[in-house]
A protein has these predicted regions:
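Compositionally biased low-complexity segments at domain edges in trafficked proteins
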Residues: 33-64
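Short beta-strand elements
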Residues: 14-45
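Generic structural signal for beta-strand residues in well-ordered domains
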Residues: 2-3, 50, 121, 209
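Single conserved hydrophobic/aromatic residue that forms the stacking wall/gate
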Residues: 1-6, 10-13
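Substrate-binding/active-site clefts of carbohydrate-active enzymes
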Residues: 55-57, 61-107, 114-238
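Hydrophobic residues within beta-strands of alpha/beta enzymes
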Residues: 109, 241-243
Length: 244
């Protein structure tokens, strides 16, 4: 709050704008600070494929879109929803609601990550070759793509190739073997031993200062090949239409 005394402005209360909320005290934890938007580099520019031009895209967060099984209604309809809540939505639930999505005039379904992970958001992926069991199986994904295609809709999946989860095999190897790990150059490790206490800045680069999502070194040819293979695998295996 502020007041005007003569021609002078006096400030009675001061608050600080953080990443998640407002704070009364100066923010010292970088994880809570507001991040400025990053500029797009020229080498990251790409051409939009013809089929995607002028299309209406509908984003789905699978864990909270629709559940095919009986769920806890009290949990499903509660408010507010926390970032860690898992409401047990799944791929079958999406399939069962494709007619509704089609009637909305949607051309492209974009799903946030569906691969194996311990979180509800699935951005800390453990295994890029396994659908998280809570969502279903590869067969369910294949059926979802087929049913979407029957309705003239495309399926785009989330390419989480910037970082992995800590339980991803390469990072686990580093945690176990330290500087002797053959995957050392897959990440940006600053020093050993690795540390990532909650609320503290890890001693390795990661997404949003969050230690559970160590950042990949995409300049490493082995990393590039691994994730190129992942992208090609799901296109061939399930006929998905693209990656975001």
């Amino acid at each position: 709050a502020s007041c005007l005394v003569g021609s002078e402005m006096c400030i009675r209360d001061r608050i600080y704008y953080g990443n998640y909320e407002f704070y009364k005290e100066c923010i010292t934890n970088r994880d809570r600070m507001f991040d400025c938007p990053q500029n797009l580099r020229e080498e990251e520019m790409f051409e939009v494929p013809d089929w995607a031009a002028n299309k209406v895209v509908y984003q789905i967060f699978p864990a909270r879109f629709a559940a095919s099984q009986q769920v806890d209604k009290e949990q499903w309809y509660k408010a507010p929803i926390s970032s860690m809540d898992d409401l047990h939505g799944d791929l079958r639930g999406i399939i069962e609601h494709l007619d509704h999505v089609q009637n909305l005039g949607i051309d492209v379904l974009y799903m946030t990550p569906i691969f194996k992970s311990y979180s509800s958001h699935k951005y800390d992926i453990i295994d890029y070759y396994q659908i998280d069991p809570s969502f279903g199986t590869t067969e369910y994904l294949r059926e979802l793509v087929q049913e979407a295609h029957k309705r003239g809709m495309k399926i785009v999946m989330d390419a989480v190739f910037n970082h992995t989860g800590r339980e991803f095999f390469a990072f686990e190897d580093i945690m176990e073997k330290g500087e002797k790990s053959k995957y050392l150059d897959w990440y940006y490790i600053e020093k050993f031993p690795l540390e990532s206490e909650r609320g503290e800045i890890p001693n390795y680069k990661c997404f949003g200062y969050y230690g559970g999502m160590p950042k990949l070194n995409l300049k490493n040819p082995e990393v590039e090949k691994f994730f190129t293979d992942v992208a090609c695998y799901w296109i061939k295996e399930c006929d998905i239409d693209g990656w975001r």
